[in-house]
Amino acid sequence: MLDTGLLLVVILASLSVMLLVSLWQQKIRGRLPPGPTPLPFIGNYLQLNTKDVYSSITQLSERYGPVFTIHLGPRRVVVLYGYDAVKEALVDQAEEFSGRGEQATYNTLFKGYGVAFSSGERAKQLRRLSIATLRDFGVGKRGVEERILEEAGYLIKMLQGTCGAPIDPTIYLSKTVSNVISSIVFGERFDYEDTEFLSLLQMMGQMNRFAASPTGQLYDMFHSVMKYLPGPQQQIIKVTQKLEDFMIEKVRQNHSTLDPNSPRNFIDSFLIRMQEEKNGNSEFHMKNLVMTTLSLFFAGSETVSSTLRYGFLLLMKHPDVEAKVHEEIEQVIGRNRQPQYEDHMKMPYTQAVINEIQRFSNLAPLGIPRRIIKNTTFRGFFLPKGTDVFPILGSLMTDPKFFPSPKDFDPQNFLDDKGQLKKNAAFLPFSTGKRFCLGDGLAKMELFLLLTTILQNFRFKFPMKLEDINESPKPLGFTRIIPKYTMSFMPI
């Protein structure tokens, strides 16, 4: 039996050999992007401001350039900062950067299944089917427009019922936007007081809040250990199972009344495809159906409702902007009909305001992580297969080369000298490349129709002085959150 001293020598020698081999392989293949030196296991955790990771990454980009490496715990991440680096990776080398990176909170639920959190051939097949099915059910067409307007009508009635009293608009918007995606996925809407519906919203909100919390950030870095430890993460693990069980039951209900010749909703279309492809290698199976449906709910609920909620705050802070939107609504739509999506072509100022709300809010500045699917050379650096990549979309939204005063809320960022809408290459709120948000068409339609319908019926009122409005999103780890507030919807 080896004594302790000899055993220690053997271990140190083995580690030294492994390190030398790793360094030799790196030298042969090429060099990794530069970055701060990580500590064992905890990586660069102590060098990051965990309350505002985006600011820390901005500071690191000033030192290391637009492509650099950080370690979030034991996980190596390559960061892409600025328009040029992001475009070169996600567009010019789209295939190599098409994998889905690690997001521990959501991976606890999705585990690599479903359209949003899968990679490789699975992601390609599910994405093709999802885009085609959403298109079949009217996304970007009149069919979904009618569903949005129907839901907008219910929202207006709810807001009228507040009689101008100050309210937090969060739950009102969440119910409305979630019901739009529900009508597409399930083929029906929920009553706003339906306990099943409220439970679904509560569980999704719980996961989103945990992911943005300090504990959620630690879990993202050290989930391999924390999943075995007591703490809030254990409750989230239970929530993920409840969400999966909820969606399994919804699929079962659809399956029991399925007519293969007449699909009623997204679930029906997926079930029919499952029946058509029964070979063992098909990606069209129950697990992917359940997780794709959940993916659509997460993507289709939070983003639009949060953007609108932040938009209300910005319009109250800038009443001159709200007044111009009211004026354009009066000129183009009037008071005697509902808005239509085709109206946005005649309403450049309103569309510029919506774009500027998205840009200024910058609620997910780090974007959604990508993953390198094969050994890749990028800007002279070697990126091994399996490396996670953060395309920092927030760096595009605040680039003074594209937005002269990025810290100011200014719809003129999207208007030319004639007051017409202009494109801005750095405005990529739905990302770009092969993994851009497949619900971007739906989100754009919702933002325009819901905002114009609300402003056609109400003026916004803040219960305190305008100077008391805090319009700056609050940094929270990997994300930014909207300040809590109340407001009044004053009937016109």
Swiss-Prot record:
PANTHER family (alphabetical): CYTOCHROME P450 508A4-RELATED, CYTOCHROME P450-RELATED
The protein's role, per its UniProt record: Highly active in the 7-alpha-hydroxylation of testosterone, progesterone and androstenedione.
Keyword vocabulary terms for this entry: Endoplasmic reticulum, Heme, Iron, Membrane, Metal-binding, Microsome, Monooxygenase, Oxidoreductase, Phosphoprotein
Modified residues (Phosphoserine): 130
Gene name tied to this protein: Cyp2a1
GO MF term list: arachidonate epoxygenase activity; heme binding; iron ion binding; oxidoreductase activity; oxidoreductase activity, acting on paired donors, with incorporation or reduction of molecular oxygen, reduced flavin or flavoprotein as one donor, and incorporation of one atom of oxygen; steroid hydroxylase activity
Reactions accelerated catalytically: an organic molecule + reduced [NADPH--hemoprotein reductase] + O2 = an alcohol + oxidized [NADPH--hemoprotein reductase] + H2O + H(+)
Pfam families: p450
Membrane topology: Peripheral membrane protein
Biological process according to GO: coumarin metabolic process; epoxygenase P450 pathway; xenobiotic metabolic process
Location of this chain's protein in the cell: Endoplasmic reticulum membrane; Microsome membrane
Keyword Protein biosynthesis included in the entry's annotation: no
Residue sites binding heme per the record: 437
Listed name of the protein: Cytochrome P450 2A1
GO cellular-component term (any): cytoplasm
EC numbers, comma separated: 1.14.14.1
Tissue spec: Liver and testis.
Stated family: Belongs to the cytochrome P450 family.
Main location: endoplasmic reticulum
Cofactor annotation: heme
